[in-house]
Amino acid sequence: MAPIKVGINGFGRIGRIVFRNAIEHPEVEIVAVNDPFIETKYAAYMLKYDSTHGIFNGEIKQEGNDLVINGKTVKFYTERDPAAIPWKETGADYVVESTGVFTTTDKAKAHLQGGAKKVIISAPSADAPMYVMVVNEKSYDGSADVISNASCTTNCLAPLAKVINDKFGIVEGLMTTVHSYTATQKTVHGPSAKDWRGGRTAAQNIIPSSTGAAKAVGKVIPELNGKLTDMSMRVPTTNVSVVDLTARIEKGASYDEIKQAIKEAAEGPLKGVLAYTEDDVVSTDMIGNPNSSIFDAKAGISLNNNFVKLVSWYDNEWGYSRRVLDLLAHVAKVDASK
């Protein structure tokens, strides 16, 4: 099967990391990028040099208004209106919508006017169907023009919750994500009318915040709808986050039995998305890890056989971006079979 031709709208953190991941993904070829706020020369610089993930492993050039990556031309556009991006002329059948702006079905559908066939939103969506790899992607039937890859935190939590719920049954649970700061936060204390705490200096504070990850898990695993709720703690690290899932389980099990169930899933049906480690890791050890969820066997605890705290790491940039491409490849295969 020839590589799937893909366009990226929005060349921010996720857009660029999706691009870097695509170089390693044999089923995907990025043929076009659109970003109205970046000129081509600067896009090449931003792709080449990354303070978190290092220097791009390959050749990047600029030819006219286009990028040339490892000898292949990537068209570069600066359209503000998604409907005006000429995806068709680039051959891009699928578009990764990573601006964080066009996250509803109606807004993201504008890409179809430019010739795209399907749009994958790299963020949660209020109304587009959400899919998480190894959790519910098999329910995709090809009918939706716009879908969502959910959030990075949902992609970490959902595989872990699936294993625990399938094996032991989750009665109820609380999830906290200890999350690296992101571009929406402030480098110095500044105005943030809708989120006063969020306006405080990102690199100086631990900031309580909200997240919709648990609610989204209820959408991709309907049996858990209403059983989980969550919060976030934004912390002064640039990348890598960690999920703390505290749950009451129906079928009693020792912590060792729970660890074994997760290990078997990570080495079996969930391999490549869920990982398992007994090493004494810290957050920077997870930079560039392509898994969505890396269960830390030594970090968890249990109070008794029905009450347990589970800890799982995730590179909220790299691992999430890899899943965007995996979902895209899955969607393309389903579409091709129709």
From Swiss-Prot:
Pathway: Carbohydrate degradation; glycolysis; pyruvate from D-glyceraldehyde 3-phosphate: step 1/5
GO cellular component, one term: cytosol
Catalytic activity: D-glyceraldehyde 3-phosphate + phosphate + NAD(+) = (2R)-3-phospho-glyceroyl phosphate + NADH + H(+)
GO molecular function ontology, one term from the record: glyceraldehyde-3-phosphate dehydrogenase (NAD+) (phosphorylating) activity
Catalytic residues (UniProt): C152
Keyword field: Cytoplasm, Glycolysis, NAD, Oxidoreductase
Coiled-coil intervals, chain numbering: none
Site (Activates thiol group during catalysis): H179
Gene3D superfamilies for the chain: Dihydrodipicolinate Reductase, domain 2, NAD(P)-binding Rossmann-like Domain
InterPro entries, A to Z: GlycerAld/Erythrose_P_DH, GlycerAld_3-P_DH_AS, GlycerAld_3-P_DH_cat, GlycerAld_3-P_DH_NAD(P)-bd, Glyceraldehyde-3-P_DH_1, NAD(P)-bd_dom_sf
Binding residues for D-glyceraldehyde 3-phosphate: S151, C152, T153, T182, T211, G212, R234
EC supergroup of this enzyme: oxidoreductase
The EC number(s) this enzyme carries: 1.2.1.12
GO BP field: glucose metabolic process; glycolytic process
UniProt-annotated location(s): Cytoplasm
Binding site for NAD(+): R13, I14, D35, R80, N316
Stored PANTHER family: GLYCERALDEHYDE 3-PHOSPHATE DEHYDROGENASE, GLYCERALDEHYDE-3-PHOSPHATE DEHYDROGENASE-RELATED
Family: Belongs to the glyceraldehyde-3-phosphate dehydrogenase family.
Subunit structure: Homotetramer.
Protein name per Swiss-Prot or TrEMBL: Glyceraldehyde-3-phosphate dehydrogenase
Upper taxonomic lineage: Eukaryota, Fungi, Dikarya, Ascomycota, Pezizomycotina
Designated gene of the protein: GPDA
